[in-house]
């Protein structure tokens, strides 16, 4: 009996120590985020004026306003109003992504300083922290967090340590990311399963990016928990019931669900948490079903109420940016790798920018990743 108690005591102590060590370990991104800054001759473009920090109510019209339950018919008037009101948010998302890509590629200090000036201005004003919002507003909050924290990660973890000379700005920015991340968690927690869809997956990516950028494990843990829920929603054939509700856009929304889930899985694996086995390999099953559906959409049409699938979105190569983390997580076939190379390089500002340079840096386009004008 004494030996049994001693063994149990030792086992408990070992588990507690293991948990403490795990909790103490700093959160890290996938290895591609450690890439050094390339240095080229020349000056950065003049720093544009900072987009007005958005501190007001996050209450916006939905571009699907007036649509039926499938939420698949575009309301052009509402979309125009939405884009006008959210312009400052979209400007900082796209602008930060563009400047970080350009800085990592060309190493011009002006791009780094401009990026930090923009983020610092929004941080100091407490942008995106309002508790007055509607569904479209809280959606914009999590998209913006994923975009900004996702791009910032490349600066924070680069082996060139570009943030070392800007400790105060980095501290303010990261503190702001953590606050926005906490609010995103409040926005998207405790939803009934029937309301958990791609929005929750994108919220998980945003919180994961913020968690790693700020080394806040509660944020990391929440993102992982949302992944568990998402994986549990994938049925045995690789369908997401709540995305099938989008009827003619069911396939497009299954595809749209994959980028954030792949990113969460990639970041989790970098920190010793392998999510690929969740629900008997749900993530791989979902990806395989989407790839098959792109070639033969009839199964999606059948499951979505005999609705012919709208393939317009799927004709845009950038919609498949999830292939980069996918092929880092799984053994992609030579044919799929060749297809990925033909479609890339992939740049998705909502994932923090140039996803190809992060996950498959050998697969670079000969042209600039930020366009000829840059």
Swiss-Prot record:
The text of the family note is: Belongs to the polysaccharide lyase 5 family.
Q: Give the catalytic activity.
A: Eliminative cleavage of alginate to give oligosaccharides with 4-deoxy-alpha-L-erythro-hex-4-enuronosyl groups at their non-reducing ends and beta-D-mannuronate at their reducing end
Its BP terms in the Gene Ontology are: alginic acid catabolic process
* Name listed for the protein in its UniProt record: Alginate lyase
In terms of pH, how does activity behave? Optimum pH is 8.1-8.4.
What are the alphabetically sorted keywords of the record?
A: Lyase, Periplasm, Signal
Q: Where in the cell is it found?
A: Periplasm
The UniProt record gives the binding positions of substrate as 62-63, 135-136, 253
List the InterPro entries.
Answer: Alginate_lyase, Alginate_lyase_dom, Chondroitin_lyas
GO terms (molecular function) for this protein are: poly(beta-D-mannuronate) lyase activity
Supply the gene name: algL
Query: According to the UniProt entry, what is the EC number of this protein?
Result: 4.2.2.3
Protein task: Catalyzes the depolymerization of alginate by cleaving the beta-1,4 glycosidic bond between two adjacent sugar residues via a beta-elimination mechanism. Splits ManA-ManA and ManA-GulA bonds, but not GulA-ManA or GulA-GulA bonds. Also cleaves acetylated residues. May serve to degrade mislocalized alginate that is trapped in the periplasmic space.
Q: Which GO terms describe its cellular component?
A: periplasmic space
Source superkingdom = Bacteria
Q: Name the source organism.
A: Azotobacter vinelandii
């Amino acid at each position: 009996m004494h030996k049994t108690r001693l063994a149990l005591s030792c086992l408990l102590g070992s588990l507690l120590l293991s948990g403490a060590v795990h909790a103490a370990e700093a959160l890290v991104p996938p290895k591609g985020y450690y890439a050094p800054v390339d240095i080229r001759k020349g000056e950065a473009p003049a720093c544009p004026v900072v987009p007005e920090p958005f501190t007001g109510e996050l209450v916006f019209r939905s571009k699907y306003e007036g649509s039926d339950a499938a939420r698949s018919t575009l309301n052009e008037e509402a979309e125009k109003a939405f884009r006008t009101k959210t312009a400052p948010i979209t400007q900082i998302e796209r602008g930060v992504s563009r400047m970080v890509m350009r800085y990592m590629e060309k190493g011009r200090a002006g791009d780094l300083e401009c990026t930090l000036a923009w983020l610092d201005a929004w941080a100091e004003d407490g942008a995106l922290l309002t508790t007055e919002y509607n569904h479209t507003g809280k959606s914009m909050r999590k998209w913006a967090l994923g975009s900004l924290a996702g791009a910032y990660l490349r600066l924070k973890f680069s082996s060139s340590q570009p943030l070392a000379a800007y400790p105060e700005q980095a501290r303010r920015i990261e503190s702001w990311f953590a606050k926005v991340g906490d609010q995103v968690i409040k926005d998207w927690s405790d939803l009934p399963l029937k309301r958990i869809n791609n929005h929750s997956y994108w919220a998980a990516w945003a919180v994961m990016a913020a968690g790693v950028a700020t080394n806040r494990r509660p944020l990391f843990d929440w993102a992982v928990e949302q992944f568990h829920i998402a994986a549990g929603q994938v049925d045995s054939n690789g369908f997401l019931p709540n995305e099938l509700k989008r009827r003619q856009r069911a396939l497009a929304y299954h595809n749209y669900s994959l980028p954030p889930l792949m990113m969460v899985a990639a970041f989790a694996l970098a920190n010793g948490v392998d999510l690929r086995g969740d629900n008997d390999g749900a993530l791989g099953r979902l990806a395989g079903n989407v790839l098959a559906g792109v070639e033969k959409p009839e199964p999606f049409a059948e499951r979505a109420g005999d609705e012919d699938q709208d393939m317009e979105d799927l004709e845009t190569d950038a919609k498949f940016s999830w292939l980069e983390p996918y092929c880092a997580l799984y053994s992609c076939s030579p044919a799929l790798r060749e297809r990925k190379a033909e479609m890339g390089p992939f740049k998705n500002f909502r994932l923090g920018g140039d996803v190809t340079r992060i996950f498959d840096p050998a697969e670079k386009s000969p042209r600039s990743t930020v366009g000829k004008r840059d």
